[in-house]
UniProtKB/Swiss-Prot annotation:
EC number: 2.3.1.180
UniProt family annotation: Belongs to the thiolase-like superfamily. FabH family.
HAMAP family xrefs: FabH
Identification of the protein by name: Beta-ketoacyl-[acyl-carrier-protein] synthase III
Region (ACP-binding): 246-250
Active site: 113, 245, 275
Catalytically driven reaction(s): malonyl-[ACP] + acetyl-CoA + H(+) = 3-oxobutanoyl-[ACP] + CO2 + CoA
GO biological process, one term: fatty acid biosynthetic process
Organism listed in the record: Wolbachia pipientis subsp. Culex pipiens (strain wPip)
Keywords, ordered alphabetically: Acyltransferase, Cytoplasm, Fatty acid biosynthesis, Fatty acid metabolism, Lipid biosynthesis, Lipid metabolism, Multifunctional enzyme, Transferase
Gene name for this UniProt entry: fabH
NCBIfam families for the chain: fabH, PRK09352.1
Primary site of residence: cytoplasm
Annotated domain remarks: The last Arg residue of the ACP-binding site is essential for the weak association between ACP/AcpP and FabH.
Name of a matching Pfam family: ACP_syn_III
Length: 318
């Protein structure tokens, strides 16, 4: 049976690194306070001239090089982002132009921190149903530093900028994407921006009810894992690696504890990258592969939750 297979991964981190001590010069906080509550030590920040599409293109080129394919072989480009260059056109079409990719159709997916999970699910469906798609390029890219309130210590310490990408192809065999699940609940308005094009004519800044986000994140991420296991007749011990959205170490630890899953089998990059929203999971996936943690044949579960609320999972055999 043909499955969507992740052929390669890529990532890009802006050169500028902002430490907790440097943030303490901006708002009333300190390194110990941030580490204890979030697990974050530093975050990467885009240069003034860098755009989300630039980060996306760099991650894409990294993935394309590893895949050893021609850009002209790519038939689909999906960019998951909350921070596009412009309201229109889509970030994906800008990326397509910068890559000089002539044979793809492209569009954005906006599901906040769950964006990459949503984008992979869409790509999985499209690559199976469209014969013209030989390879799909799926990117999560964010410049979250542009939509945080740098006077709000409860949110500005949490986020960073980055991009991660994967090349997906349809392939016969046991490896590949096994299942996905997506959920949303528009009634849970606990993470949002205080503006938007049609309401305030600007993008606004991030607002968050931290306590409620923690509660919902732990409950829904745990439920998403349990749903995936049930649908595939698996037990938690069958999972080789868990890659959760890199939002906060406390959320990750609470989910792992509820699942009775060994923390040693969890990919954690939140200390180095902070919360990079839709880029979080592809960035962590690329890191885990480059560090030879994830190996061929491993069963890997990706889980995420974001504003909306949106949440979901992707189960794959690498």
């Amino acid at each position: 049976m043909s499955k969507s297979f992740i052929l390669s991964t890529g990532s890009y981190l802006p050169k500028k690194i902002l430490s907790n001590n440097e943030i303490a010069l901006i708002v009333e906080t300190n390194d110990e306070w941030i580490r204890q509550r979030t697990g974050i030590v530093q975050r990467h920040i885009a240069d003034e001239g860098e755009l989300t599409s630039d980060l996306a293109v760099n991650a894409a080129k990294n993935a394309i090089e590893k895949a050893k394919i021609s850009i002209d072989e790519i038939g689909l480009i999906i960019v998951a982002t909350t921070t596009p260059d412009k309201t229109l056109p889509s970030c994906a079409t800008i990326v397509q132009s910068k890559l000089k990719c002539k044979n793809a159709f492209s569009f954005d997916v906006q599901a906040a921190c769950s964006g990459f999970i949503y984008a992979v699910t869409v790509a999985d469906s499209l690559i199976k149903s469209h014969n013209r798609i030989k390879y799909a390029l799926v990117i999560g890219a964010e410049i979250m530093s542009r939509i945080v309130d740098w006077e709000d210590r409860s949110t500005c310490v949490l986020f960073g900028d980055s991009a991660g990408a994967v090349i997906i192809k349809s392939e016969m065999g046991s490896s590949g994407i096994i299942s996905t699940n997506l959920h949303s609940d528009g009634n849970v308005d606990i993470l949002c921006t205080n503006g938007g094009v049609s309401s305030t004519r600007d993008s606004g800044k991030i607002l968050m009810n931290g306590r409620e986000v923690f509660k919902h994140a732990v409950d829904k991420l745990t439920a998403s894992v349990e749903e995936t296991l049930k649908c595939n007749n698996l037990k938690i011990i069958d999972i080789d690696w868990l890659i959760p959205h890199q939002a906060n170490i406390r959320i990750i630890e609470a989910v792992v504890k509820k699942l009775d899953f060994p923390i040693e089998k969890v990919i954690n990059t939140v200390d180095k990258h902070a919360n990079t929203s839709a880029a979080s999971i592809p960035l962590a996936l690329d890191y885990a592969i480059q560090e030879s943690k994830i190996k061929s044949g491993n069963l890997v579960l990706l889980i995420s939750i974001g504003a909306g609320l949106t949440w979901g999972s992707v189960l794959l055999r690498y």
